[in-house]
């Protein structure tokens, strides 16, 4: 299979490329990435001689068309993803997430190429903390941030192109990921690298917000399963049934790093901070036989901490800029 991976130099995309090559799942991989602050050549350095990396904008219709024409399938990760950045400036999110997805859809329509579109559980809004319900494939969309609204718009474009033009596409909505190569602006790597650089970890508000955590390799194994075995036009929800509130995750990280679990600062909460995300992955499990492998959250966190300890040269150049932005916001 000749595979085009958009956003393949970002966190989840780069890990997907590593997984596909590690398990010999494809004959060739082309990565299209704008290499903005969140994309890094270094994330692909271990496999650089086995892929083709093209730097370019996902909205460049001519470039995208040429790359899609050479491919048997496209996995579309490319997106702006950080909620705090979307609150400060939503325009790049509209550009990449909405116009970028439209550009991909037009290219795969023209060349009749299989597409898998990667999305987020944030399109469903949030759940009350005391509500046992979980998101499933029939949950109505109710996005609450500039980020999630652009991802919801992208999902709906994919659905419309499937129905109107017969595009061969699937969608997945996944819960919060963790693992290697995640940018230090994100919650888990921020706390790990704060400890490693002698800074105090920072927790938004009281830390009661609940997230459903999944290791990035489990997410990507599900994406591959959907790409190869999923039903065209379907949406699949990906989760590992690992709900933790942010306070618990913070204390677990500190404990695993040999620190006092209460040695952190409470900082200003995010505006409109969603309360709880929770995914019911039963359709994916029952229909496609997928199951996560990284089911021990503490073991997964330990591996992630070890990766950041061993790869300071990857994240250290990013750290000061990220923390300066957080400091400006009182976070």
Curated annotation (Swiss-Prot):
CDD domains: dTDP_GD_SDR_e
One Pfam family it belongs to: GDP_Man_Dehyd
GO MF annotations, alphabetized: dTDP-glucose 4,6-dehydratase activity
SUPFAM superfamilies hit by this protein: NAD(P)-binding Rossmann-fold domains
Keyword Lyase: yes
Catalytic activity line of the entry: dTDP-alpha-D-glucose = dTDP-4-dehydro-6-deoxy-alpha-D-glucose + H2O
Cofactor: NAD(+)
Gene Ontology BP annotations: dTDP-rhamnose biosynthetic process; polysaccharide biosynthetic process
Sequence positions that bind substrate: 81, 120, 176, 186-191, 202-204, 211, 246, 269-273
Cofactor note: Binds 1 NAD(+) per subunit.
Pathway(s) it belongs to: Carbohydrate biosynthesis; dTDP-L-rhamnose biosynthesis
Domain of life: Bacteria
Binding site for NAD(+): 11-12, 33-36, 57-58, 77-81, 96, 147-151, 177
Keyword field: Lyase, NAD
Active site: 121-122, 147
Family (UniProt): Belongs to the NAD(P)-dependent epimerase/dehydratase family. dTDP-glucose dehydratase subfamily.
Function: Catalyzes the dehydration of dTDP-D-glucose to form dTDP-6-deoxy-D-xylo-4-hexulose via a three-step process involving oxidation, dehydration and reduction. Involved in the biosynthesis of the dTDP-L-rhamnose which is a component of the critical linker, D-N-acetylglucosamine-L-rhamnose disaccharide, which connects the galactan region of arabinogalactan to peptidoglycan via a phosphodiester linkage.
PANTHER family reported for this sequence: DTDP-D-GLUCOSE 4,6-DEHYDRATASE-RELATED
NCBIfam families: dTDP_gluc_dehyt
Subunit structure, as described in the record: Homodimer.
Stated name of the protein: dTDP-glucose 4,6-dehydratase
């Amino acid at each position: 299979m000749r595979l085009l991976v958009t956003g393949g130099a970002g966190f989840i995309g780069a890990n997907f490329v590593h997984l596909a090559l590690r398990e010999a799942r494809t004959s060739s991989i082309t990565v299209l990435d704008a290499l903005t602050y969140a994309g890094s050549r270094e994330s692909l350095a271990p496999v650089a001689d086995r892929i083709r990396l093209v730097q370019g904008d996902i909205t460049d219709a001519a470039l995208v068309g040429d790359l899609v024409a050479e491919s048997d399938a496209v996995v579309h990760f490319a997106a702006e993803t950080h909620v705090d950045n979307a609150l400060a400036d939503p325009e790049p999110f509209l550009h990449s997430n909405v116009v970028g997805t439209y550009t991909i859809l037009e290219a795969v329509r023209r060349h009749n190429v299989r597409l898998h579109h990667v999305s987020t559980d944030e399109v469903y809004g949030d759940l009350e903390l005391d509500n046992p319900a979980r998101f499933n494939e029939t949950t109505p969309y109710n996005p609450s941030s500039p980020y999630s609204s652009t991802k919801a718009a992208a999902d709906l474009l994919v659905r419309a192109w499937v129905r109107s033009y017969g595009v061969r596409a699937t969608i997945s909505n996944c819960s919060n990921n963790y693992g290697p190569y995640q940018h230090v602006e994100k919650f888990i790597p921020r706390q790990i690298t704060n400890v490693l650089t002698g800074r105090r970890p920072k927790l938004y508000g009281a830390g009661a917000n609940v997230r459903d955590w999944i290791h990035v390799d489990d997410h990507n194994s599900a994406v591959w399963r959907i790409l190869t075995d999923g039903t065209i036009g379907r949406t699949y929800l990906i989760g590992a049934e690992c709900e933790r509130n942010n306070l618990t995750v913070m204390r677990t990280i500190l404990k695993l790093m040999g620190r006092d679990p209460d040695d952190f600062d409470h900082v200003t909460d995010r505006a409109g901070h969603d309360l709880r995300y929770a995914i019911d992955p039963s359709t994916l499990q029952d229909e496609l036989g997928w199951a996560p492998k990284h089911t021990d959250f503490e073991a997964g966190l330990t591996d992630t901490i070890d990766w950041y300890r061993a790869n300071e040269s990857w994240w250290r150049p990013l750290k000061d800029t990220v923390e300066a932005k957080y400091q400006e916001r009182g976070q």
